[in-house]
Amino acid sequence: AEYPADLGGDSGRYTSGADRWVSNEPLVGKQASYLGYILVLAGLRTWSLAYDWVMPVQLLFTAAAACAAFGLGRDVAGRLAGFLAALWLVENPDIAIWNRYLLTDSLYISSLVITLWAWHRAVIRWKPVLLVAAVMLLLWTMTIRPNGWILLPLMVLFLAFRLGAWKAVLTVALPGIVLLVVAVLLLKPLQSGIQNENPMDFLSKGIVIWDYDAWNREMPPTEMNSTNDWRNIGSYAMRYPVETLTLVAARVGIVLARVRPYYPWQMNLRIGIRYTVMYGLLLLGLIWYWRHLAVKLLVAAIVLHLGVVGLTVASWDGRFLTHFFPLIAV
């Protein structure tokens, strides 16, 4: 089929998944890890709309995310800060470009901002309807991309922190995290979802940027077949802590730098100037507003997303930074 929407390497996974869902066939491979996006496409097909209609859906979510970014920025530092946060979300070409792609990135970027805004509002006002809406948004965002699952422990800790007592941490946060760990270790669908991302294979091969071998790091050899199970990451990291941490730091560093050796120098210059300014403003914002609850929530979300990159790979096109760039903008 021909699509006005631009297609990426993974677009076929989502359209095929939507076709299978509408036909009441089980999802295959990595498709279950992107259930939320596949359901959006399946809904379009159910309504006899072409998959290209996902573009206006993504634009609507971007508009909602801009409003959420405005709300977060306003809560932290006033209306001007909110306006700038919303502006930097919608005018950033690195984010806007994904609105026209039949890929999960645009919807995840927008949903992440909306979800964090909803949770911040919910724990400030403590109204049942807001808490229910925040939980629903959390579940939605978790299903768009595999890295959305990091929001679950984040929100458990955020809720416990908001309650403001060690008793709350012990009664809410720790049991929640323990249950999550048990689920990851015991539930086959979650295990398969993690294994499908090949984190142990990426680690053993020293891959920094996906599909760019020039920057791969030489790593110590692994035992036979050890790369077939992601749970071997722990034992490998304990055996080679320096090499593992160096690789993780390289991945995180290249994600934050955003430039790439294969980009034109003019593009790298533009990116370098933009993100140098943004990181400088981020540092000032942390110094001035660290005590604000929303800032702590946003920083925690940024750190967790960087952690996911550290355990997997940096993207070839730099898109992983765009997933949480609006949080930096706020």
Residue ranges and their predicted role:
Residues R74-R79, T115-L130:
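Membrane-interface transmembrane helices that cradle and orient dolichyl/undecaprenyl
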Residues A183-W265:
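Membrane-proximal stem/loop segments at transmembrane-domain junctions that anchor or position
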Residues W53, R239-G307:
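Membrane-interface anchor segments at the N-terminal boundary of transmembrane helices
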